[in-house]
Amino acid sequence: MRVLISEEKIQQRVRELGAQIEKDYPDGVQLIGILKGATFFLADLARAMKCQARLDFIGISSYGKGKTSSGEVKLTKDLDATVEGADVLVVEDIVDSGVTLNYLMQVLRQRRPKSLKIAALLDKPDRRIRPVEVSYVGFQIPDEFVIGYGLDYAENYRNLRDICVLEETPA
Ligand code: IMP
Ligand code: MG
């Protein structure tokens, strides 16, 4: 395991993103975190903003237990609140193929929010197979499998404070 982005760098960047988002949404924003990977990012991002932020969560699965996508997307938990007429910001840990967010944006657009944008901590642009417009990006990273700060490998390592590259598949 090798540290790719340290805790300090993550926290610094999240503060910058929070300040930018706060400026863009002076009347408040409805944050939608994608379970479970985005939970740490969402918690820190929300506290980096001084505007009103409502929190909601949605569950989507597109990955199996390993490092590759199953290519299949399904909603595993829906939102608690309606997004109709709201300024909505989807908060995601990482955009990889784009399949998950491309699908989710279609679903949410049908519910007629006033505005709909995406904040993603990490972006692997080389891997994109479906178009996704990400308005706020923390870091662009190369095509490597990362864990920590919410990101998992087979549900492990989410609680690491740094973002690390998993170089070998653990036994
Ligand atoms: P996409 O649909 O391929 O864009 O995949 C997005 C989802 O795949 C993210 O929400 C993550 O849960 C997962 N994912 C993609 N790349 C990584 C990675 O490097 N580490 C951990 N999870 C990843
Ligand atoms: Mg995820």
Q: Can you say where each PLM-predicted feature lies in the sequence?
A:
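PRPP-associated nucleotide enzymes
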Residues: 1-171
